[in-house]
């Protein structure tokens, strides 16, 4: 498939999830998203209203992070926070699974949590992304989560929060994609800092990229295409 610069930009969730991010930082994030035509801004739940107002009358989504970054909230509180974020303008949701219950092999809990989160998101026609936080998981646990997701059908499964010991890995993206196929999309996030990282994740099967380096990545891709005198880059997946 051939990608233009705008195609690449529309794969990016432009991210600022720092605890000390000010309204000025959020405005900058939204302004950059508008300038580069990114798909979404990824922000903490409390900033949903501010960012959605900044992005009013655009096709750029406001993505709220729920139970972030540890996932250590009850299902009920995650559902409540999700609905609150949506009512305050969020139109995409990224939530972190309860890793403790996964480690306990309480797959019924994980399945119920995912089902309730998908249901509350889809009630409002909002995409739901499930964050695995792969750095804490074995390959078998990643596989098990992907199998559950294939059954429950969230819109995306996601590699990482970006706040753990490590972020997205090409082999994990390939594994996740190999299980869910075209039924569920895959988002890679965490440690994607340059255009080579970005292209590697897309080639591995990522349908969305979460990163704070979106501007740097798009500018580098523009330069690469200019140097090669091309308007598209072909990606074989």
Swiss-Prot record:
The active site is at residues 94, 158, 187. One of its GO terms (cellular component) is cytoplasm. SUPFAM superfamilies: Aldolase. It comes from the Bacteria. The keyword Lyase applies. GO terms for biological process: 2-deoxyribose 1-phosphate catabolic process; carbohydrate catabolic process; deoxyribonucleotide catabolic process. Its EC number is 4.1.2.4. SMART domains: DeoC. It catalyses: 2-deoxy-D-ribose 5-phosphate = D-glyceraldehyde 3-phosphate + acetaldehyde. InterPro entries: Aldolase_TIM, DeoC, DeoC/FbaB/LacD_aldolase, DeoC_typeI. Pathway: Carbohydrate degradation; 2-deoxy-D-ribose 1-phosphate degradation; D-glyceraldehyde 3-phosphate and acetaldehyde from 2-deoxy-alpha-D-ribose 1-phosphate: step 2/2. GO terms for molecular function: deoxyribose-phosphate aldolase activity. Keywords: Cytoplasm, Lyase, Schiff base. It is found in: Cytoplasm. Catalyzes a reversible aldol reaction between acetaldehyde and D-glyceraldehyde 3-phosphate to generate 2-deoxy-D-ribose 5-phosphate. Belongs to the DeoC/FbaB aldolase family. DeoC type 1 subfamily. HAMAP family: DeoC_type1. NCBIfam families: deoC. This is Deoxyribose-phosphate aldolase. It comes from Lactobacillus johnsonii (strain CNCM I-12250 / La1 / NCC 533).
């Amino acid at each position: 498939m051939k990608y233009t610069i705008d195609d690449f930009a529309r794969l990016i969730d432009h991210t600022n999830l720092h605890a000390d991010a000010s309204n000025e930082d959020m405005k900058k994030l939204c302004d950059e998203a508008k300038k580069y035509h990114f798909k979404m801004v990824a922000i903490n739940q409390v900033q949903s209203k501010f960012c959605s107002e900044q992005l009013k009358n655009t096709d750029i989504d406001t993505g709220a992070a729920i139970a972030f970054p540890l996932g250590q909230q009850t299902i009920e509180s995650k559902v409540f926070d999700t609905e609150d974020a949506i009512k305050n303008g969020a139109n995409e949701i990224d939530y972190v699974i309860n890793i403790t219950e996964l480690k306990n092999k309480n797959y019924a809990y994980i399945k119920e949590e995912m089902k309730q989160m998908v249901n509350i998101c889809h009630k409002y026609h909002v995409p739901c992304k499930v964050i695995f936080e792969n750095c804490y998981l074995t390959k078998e646990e990643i596989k098990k989560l992907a199998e559950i997701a294939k059954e429950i059908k969230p819109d995306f499964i996601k590699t990482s929060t970006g706040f753990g010991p490590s972020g997205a890995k090409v082999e994990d993206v390939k594994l996740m994609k190999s299980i869910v196929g075209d039924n569920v999309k895959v988002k890679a996030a965490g440690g994607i800092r340059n255009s080579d990282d970005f292209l590697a994740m897309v080639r591995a099967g990522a349908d969305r990229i979460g990163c704070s380096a979106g501007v740097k990545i798009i500018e580098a891709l523009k330069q690469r295409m200019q140097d090669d005198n091309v308007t598209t880059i072909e990606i074989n997946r």
